Amino acid sequence: MCLPLILTIKIINIIINMFNKTNKKINILGKTREELYDFFIKIGEEKFRAEQIMKWIYKRYCDDVSLMTDFSKNLKNKLKNIIKIDHLDIESENISQDGTIKWVLKINDQNIETVYIPEINRATLCISSQIGCALNCKFCATSYQGFNRNLNSYEIISQIWYAMKIINDRNNFKLKKITNIVMMGMGEPLLNLKNLVPAIKIILDNYGFGLSKRRITISTAGISPVIKKLGKLIDVKLAISLHAPNDIIRNKIMPINKKYNIKSILLSAKKYISTSKANKGKISIEYIMLNEINDKTEHAYQLINCLKNIPCKINLIPWNPFPYVKYKCSNFNKINNFYKILIKHGITTTIRKQRGIDIKAACGQLSGNVINRINKRNIINF
């Protein structure tokens, strides 16, 4: 039975008054289309308003309701009282000689880093999912910051929104539009699934950023139970940060391996790609090259054996230096030899180009500009 019109209006007014009294406006950046449908219905508006406002936010990078020309004056005034479109502010910008840009974004007294990497045929945005990281990978600068907290969905989305807005505003500089997004910044994405999934839904939504699922990559150190859950929630490309050919080495450089070993990670990943359309039947394996740690000829053959039943492609990553750790990157000859062995055995392999190393924006170097505040751990020697 439908409620009388007068009663319906009273309920809507009560809801709006509640927003006004608490003086807590809802930040709609980072809200999925479904969440916005519910919101507009609750305040007595048609659900298509959700699609309109998403177009303004994610296609035109508008954060001011008063500029949304297809909203009536009454609706604008109504929304101004109950919503906000907040995004993170920039603390600093660094531009590399190779065109890579690193933005440090401020979150209260903390910050996160986001990296824009232009290439010939595409431009990739590397975003963060946490402030710091709890996994303590020995070769990664973020782990030396320690873990602060998960980013919420608006903070994840804000990185993309900000980067796309800058590129749009600087069109005279001919910056390439972002074509790919990788969750390879600060933090372990799969330990923040609650906020990651809504953010990815917005990235994929045609009323959001509208990117293809094959252009979104989640990189994980290997949280096996969450990989199993992921396929039921979202379908995007998955990359496993393996970085070792056996559990003995991986236990030393990636302590999470003591909980989720290589076998369990690869089995979970194999199951994920079996139902994923985004991955085209192959999982990406990331392998950082550490001198005398995991780069010997015997390690290449161990890796081949480890992956013999896993449809995959391997990305060899030269290690990028940061303070307090005495690792060294494998030299070119070692990396090239490792590469040739993998190729010879039929494994699709690439060597990642080092980008943004001069501004500490390369793989493994992101630390949120807090490296000087870190409790300096013992130097790692092997």
Swiss-Prot record:
Enzyme class: transferase
GO function terms (MF aspect): 4 iron, 4 sulfur cluster binding; metal ion binding; rRNA (adenine(2503)-C2-)-methyltransferase activity; rRNA binding; tRNA (adenine(37)-C2)-methyltransferase activity; tRNA binding
TM segment ranges: none
SUPFAM superfamilies recorded: Radical SAM enzymes (SSF102114)
Short name of any one Pfam family annotated for the protein: RlmN_N
Keyword Chloroplast in record: no
Main location as per UniProt: cytoplasm
Subcellular location, record wording: Cytoplasm
Keyword Repeat attached: no
Catalysed reactions, semicolon-separated: adenosine(2503) in 23S rRNA + 2 reduced [2Fe-2S]-[ferredoxin] + 2 S-adenosyl-L-methionine = 2-methyladenosine(2503) in 23S rRNA + 5'-deoxyadenosine + L-methionine + 2 oxidized [2Fe-2S]-[ferredoxin] + S-adenosyl-L-homocysteine; adenosine(37) in tRNA + 2 reduced [2Fe-2S]-[ferredoxin] + 2 S-adenosyl-L-methionine = 2-methyladenosine(37) in tRNA + 5'-deoxyadenosine + L-methionine + 2 oxidized [2Fe-2S]-[ferredoxin] + S-adenosyl-L-homocysteine
Residues annotated as binding [4Fe-4S] cluster: 133, 137, 140
GO biological process, one term: rRNA base methylation
Cofactor(s) essential for the protein: [4Fe-4S] cluster
EC numbers, comma separated: 2.1.1.192
InterPro entries tied to this protein: Aldolase_TIM, Methyltransferase_A, RlmN_N, RNA_MTrfase_RlmN, rRNA_lsu_MTrfase_RlmN/Cfr, rSAM
Disulfide bonds: 126-363
GO cellular component, one term: cytoplasm
Keywords on record: 4Fe-4S, Cytoplasm, Disulfide bond, Iron, Iron-sulfur, Metal-binding, Methyltransferase, rRNA processing, S-adenosyl-L-methionine, Transferase, tRNA processing
Residues covered by the Radical SAM core domain: 119-358
Function: Specifically methylates position 2 of adenine 2503 in 23S rRNA and position 2 of adenine 37 in tRNAs. m2A2503 modification seems to play a crucial role in the proofreading step occurring at the peptidyl transferase center and thus would serve to optimize ribosomal fidelity.
PANTHER family named in the record: 23S RRNA METHYLTRANSFERASE, RADICAL SAM CORE DOMAIN-CONTAINING PROTEIN
Protein family (similarity comment): Belongs to the radical SAM superfamily. RlmN family.
UniProt miscellaneous comment: Reaction proceeds by a ping-pong mechanism involving intermediate methylation of a conserved cysteine residue.
Name the UniProt record assigns to this protein: Dual-specificity RNA methyltransferase RlmN
Organism: Wigglesworthia glossinidia brevipalpis
The encoding gene: rlmN
